[in-house]
């Protein structure tokens, strides 16, 4: 069953947002588990929302553990973070 992880990040400044996203772009392909889909949206001048869909809840948990390493290394750019995860609802 597909599961999703949704992460909203608010950054300290525009420069912090640029630096964080640049680091993420380089780091993510080498470290994050394969996702069915992954979309990042700029939700405000200093915020973004990432939604990734994974094959199972186990992969979501692995993704959470892995991304925490990146977040810990880049906390100086972040003002706040809110994360959600759950089963994908199929409406077909």
Q: Locations of the language-model features?
A:
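Short S/T/G/P-rich N-terminal loop/turn motif that feeds into the first structured element of a domain
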Residues: 1-69, 76-92
